[in-house]
């Protein structure tokens, strides 16, 4: 019995030592995970014709620096980049354009394995796309619309990658290059969006406050005030929710392409940005009216200031994003569950086949 116990103990000890020996390489592999810089180096070294791309890209960048802008009235420079900087810095609705190139590069890093595996070759038909990009810029240069030239600039970069690395690269990099669209300033074109957004937000806010909450208000177009005119708020273009719509649309586009593969699901996620952004702006406007009504009732004469505080507060200005992000994640959860339910019958049937 003692001999059997000793033998069992020895076998258990040997098994433990073997497990430790087997786990050491795994730990070494975990510790040897490549760094971000190493992964970037791997991506760059895996791309052919790098010298050709750098030469074409450098020429493209220099061209738009010296012949990119013809509207010298706003900022006295021919550089498209200086005009972009001026536009981004003077419009809060367009300042997202500063970080769009970084977002695109970051998502290219995220897709590095896919980009490395696609077949690459020099594809001369992409010269048609490059010519088309130059044509877009020429139109913008002639009509003095620098934002049109920005479209040509970004589309040209996308076309140059197709010229150097082929059509499969263009297909694989369509997203995130699609996000370059958010680097184009909206400018005066925003009026076609801000006006209907202002009216929609005003109508919904007026109905919620007046009908659901029973607040004695008067709505006249985009202006909402209480019946005694103690506080008045106008939903102007700056309060239409355009900024939150742009940010929400950009985030939803990223989320749609990253989390889903089916086109209709991606489209559903992206399109949901419009109603959810409006819902977020309505929440903010409703809180402004509520704050004004509560303080006006408690301290007469303080209602307008209370509403202005909610409007101007930096933290409270983030409120429109809360229902938007919660809504899209719920929608994404529903779509994900739909995917899982579709796979369950397949698993069951495969199990039956195995049993047979």
Model-assigned labels for residue ranges:
Residues 37-56:
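N-terminal membrane topogenic signal
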Residues 65-92, 100, 192-231:
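Extracytosolic (periplasmic/ER-lumenal) interhelical loops and adjacent juxtamembrane/interface segments
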Residues 89-130:
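Hydrophobic alpha-helical transmembrane segments in multi-pass integral membrane proteins
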Residues 92, 234, 240, 269-277, ...:
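Membrane-interface transmembrane-helix boundary segments in multi-pass integral membrane proteins
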Residues 94-99, 144-149, 232-254, 315-322:
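Membrane-interface loop-to-helix entry segments
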Residues 97-108, 155-164, 175, 247-253, ...:
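Hydrophobic cores of alpha-helical transmembrane segments in multi-pass inner/ER membrane proteins
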Residues 119-128, 148-153, 170-179:
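Cytoplasmic-side transmembrane-helix entry/capping segments in multi-pass membrane proteins
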Residues 138-148, 164-169, 188-192, 235-238:
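Membrane-interface helix caps and helix-loop-helix hairpins in membrane proteins
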């Amino acid at each position: 019995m003692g001999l059997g116990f000793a033998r069992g103990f020895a076998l258990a000890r040997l098994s433990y030592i073997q497990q430790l020996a087997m786990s050491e390489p795994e730990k070494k592999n975990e510790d040897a995970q490549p760094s971000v810089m190493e992964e970037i180096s791997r991506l760059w070294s895996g791309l052919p014709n790098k010298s050709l791309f750098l030469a074409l890209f450098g020429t493209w960048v220099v061209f738009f620096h010296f012949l990119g802008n013809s509207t010298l009235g706003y900022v006295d420079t021919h550089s498209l980049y200086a005009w972009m900087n001026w536009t981004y810095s003077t419009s809060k609705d367009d300042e997202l354009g500063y970080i769009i190139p970084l977002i695109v590069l970051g998502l290219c890093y995220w897709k590095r394995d896919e980009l490395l595996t696609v077949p690459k070759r020099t594809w001369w038909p992409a010269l048609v796309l490059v010519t088309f990009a130059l044509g877009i810029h020429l139109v913008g240069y002639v009509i003095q619309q620098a934002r049109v030239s920005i479209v040509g600039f970004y589309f040209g970069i996308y076309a140059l990658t197709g010229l150097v690395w082929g059509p499969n690269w263009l297909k694989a990099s369509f997203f995130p290059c699609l996000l370059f669209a958010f680097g184009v300033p909206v400018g005066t074109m925003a009026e076609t969006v801000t006006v209907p957004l202002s009216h929609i937000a005003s109508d919904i806010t007026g109905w919620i406050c007046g009908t659901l909450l029973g607040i004695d208000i008067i709505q006249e177009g985009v202006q909402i005030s209480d019946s005694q005119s103690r506080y008045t708020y106008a939903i102007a273009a700056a309060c239409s929710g355009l900024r939150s719509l742009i940010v929400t649309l950009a985030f939803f586009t990223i989320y749609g392409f990253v989390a889903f593969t089916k086109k209709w699901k991606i489209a559903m996620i992206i399109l949901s940005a419009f109603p959810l952004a409006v819902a977020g702006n309505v929440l903010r406007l409703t809180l402004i009216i509520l704050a004004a009504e509560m303080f006006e009732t408690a301290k007469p004469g303080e209602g307008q200031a209370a509403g202005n505080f909610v409007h101007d507060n930096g933290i409270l200005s983030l409120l429109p994003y809360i229902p938007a992000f919660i809504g899209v994640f719920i929608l994404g959860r529903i779509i994900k569950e739909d995917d899982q339910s579709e796979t369950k019958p397949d698993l069951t049937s495969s199990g039956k086949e195995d049993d047979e």
